[in-house]
Each structure stands twice: as structure tokens, then as C-alpha cells.
Amino acid sequence: MKVENFAKILNADFYTGVPDSQLKALCNYLMHTYGIDPKHHVIAANEGNCTALAAGYHLATGKVPVVYMQNSGEGNIINPVASLLNDKVYAIPMIFVIGWRGEPGIHDEPQHIYQGEVTLKLLEDMGIRYFVIGKDTTEEEVSAAMQDFRKELDCGEDVAFVIRKGALSYEEKVEYRNDNPMIREEIIRHIVQASGEDPIVSTTGKASRELFEIREHNGQSHKYDFLTVGSMGHSSSIALGVAVQKPGTKVWCVDGDGAVLMHMGSMAVLGSTAPENMVHIVINNGAHETVGGMPTVAANIDLVAIAGACGYPNAVSVTTYEELDRELVAAKERDALTFIEVKCGIGAREDLGRPTTTALENKQNFMEYLKECR
């Protein structure tokens, strides 16, 4: 169904969410209709933030907000749903629009499989009534479901529309770009060159896919890399855990701006721990590129200042490959925690592949390699 008609059925004037490729039609519609507007549309750091922000909107207006998200974000909403929204607490009504990755019976990437299996069960456990929208679902069926949901919403309960792949359509094309000339895949190529045989923990999305293909192109082993294919926002904490246990080995984390924002508190712990053998690189294109390109707030904030305030003893931002190479060499030689922000353009190769090894194989090979490290 057309996303414009879906929005009319929802009849909401405030949306907040974390972008999802399954919801690209809705995301593009919201950007085309509202852009980023605190009164009507906010892209928040994580799904729990969205839920709290939407709760504040309801408290101020008495109206019902919409929170959109990928099903991988269900874990982030459990706490505010259970201890803030629930009708045994504050009874705050909300409409969740959830992209269903990893739906049973439909091929998807490994990080989505289990989440897809438990998506509906988690909603049931949270007491959230849901309606699944597929390609063949009619507007009349969605409208009837929304009308039925009004009873729950009027009682301060929460409801959800679970969106299958291709269920929503939007004809208007929205392009996302910035003026940064550097290309993420080339940035990662430079990191691989500088890091040598040091272990790398890479963030979810296209960065890990590009790292995998660079190793393939170079004829190098994948044992050096832990590809954090899911678990968005946690790669730096994984890298910290490795670095603390392997103090004689330089550990590199290749992170993204959307991931850093999602769980930014990890930077405070990382800076306070200050492992001398870790390099934290954030490739900042100011966008959730892997799921469509919608903007993050990272273009508006000073990540270097944040890193410094969190206790990183060395923090820099680079905008050219020459600057990047210089800082990578310095980080390699330095016995101190280093933070490098790399300003990056939006975009990737059309033929970018996916890892051909399984997640378990990746883990086993990485762990075997770490046994050789000090």
C-alpha cells in the first residue's frame, strides 16, 4: 500500500524512530514531508530514546505518537515499555511501526534470523497488540485494524504494525548526500594497511561488508577481524573487552556515527578505562547509510570534544587521506588510547557483497587468532 495512505490511517502528527531499510518508504515519506522537525519528526539515537521522547510528546499534548524501528530495536524498547508506558505504570499510548527483518521462511542475514523468530512473541510478552502488514494487505484491512486499536490506545495501551518487506511503497525519490570527499571503503583500506596483523572489530552494516571484501581482494585471512554484523552500537565495547585482555596487542575498532550515537555511554567507559593498546575510529558520514541514508545528528556535534571529555587522551578529526595516514601511523606507534574521527561521504559500491563465511566461523577464527596475541 502507498505509505501516504498508511500515514493517513495512523492519523498522527509526531513521529520518532531509528531508520530501517524495511521501512524505507515511510522514512523517505517523513523526510519529504517534515524533514527533521522537532515538532513532527525526530530521528533519535536509539529505540529506547524514541520511546521516551514519544512519551514526553504524549504528556505534553495528550496525543498518540508513532515510533518506527527495525525489529532489532525491540530489545531497546523493553525497559521503557515495561516501566514507563505500561498501563500498570503511566499508561502512555503509543503506535509502534516495526520492520520485520528475519521473518521465518524468508532468507535474511544471520543477525536477523533469531530476532525475526521472536519478533511477534516479544510484542505479545510486552502486552502490545499487533497487526502484520504484507504486500497483499488492503488499506481497508489496515484501517479496520487501526479502528480496533483505538480501544487499546484510549485505555493507555500500546499497539504495533509489523511491516513485511515491500509492504509499503513511496514514489518520491529522496537522495541523501554530503560534501565529504572521502569514501568509506577506501578509508577502511587505509586502516587495514596501517593495522597490519592487529585485530580489528568492525561495526554493523556496510563497514564490515567492505572490510571482508578488502581482505578477500588482498588475499588476506579473515582471522584478524571480528565483524559485528548485528548488535548496533556495541562494537567499541567488544573491542574494549578484547584490548583489556590482550594488553600487548594493538586492537582497532572501526565504528560508525550512527552506532556511536546509539550507545554513546560506552565512550565514557572506554575513556575512563583508557586501554593503552586501543584505537577507536569513527567513520562519520552523518547518515544511517546501511538502512537508506537518513541523517544522524553526528554532523551537528563535536565527536572529538566528546571523546576528550570522556577521557580519551588523544582525539583528532581528519578530512583527507593524507591526514588519515598520518594519524593511523601515530596511533599504531602510540602507547595510549586514540580516537580518530574520519569525515566521510555517503555511498557504497552497487556490487558490494556480503561475508561468505558464517558468523560462527568468524568468531572461531578470530578467537583462534587471539590465542596467539599477548
Regions found by a protein language model. Name each.
Residues 1-124, 128, 132-238, 244-245, ...:
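Thiamine diphosphate
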Residues 69-72, 249-260, 265-267:
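DG-centered beta-turn motif at the end of beta-strands
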Residues 81-82, 91-94, 264-284:
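A short alpha/beta connector and helix-capping loop motif
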Residues 150, 320-333:
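A short, acidic, amphipathic alpha-helical segment used as a generic capping/interface helix at domain edges
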Residues 163, 254-257, 283, 340-342:
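Active-site flanking residues adjacent to catalytic metal/cofactor-binding acidic residues
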Residues 245-255, 274-277:
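Phosphate-handling active-site elements
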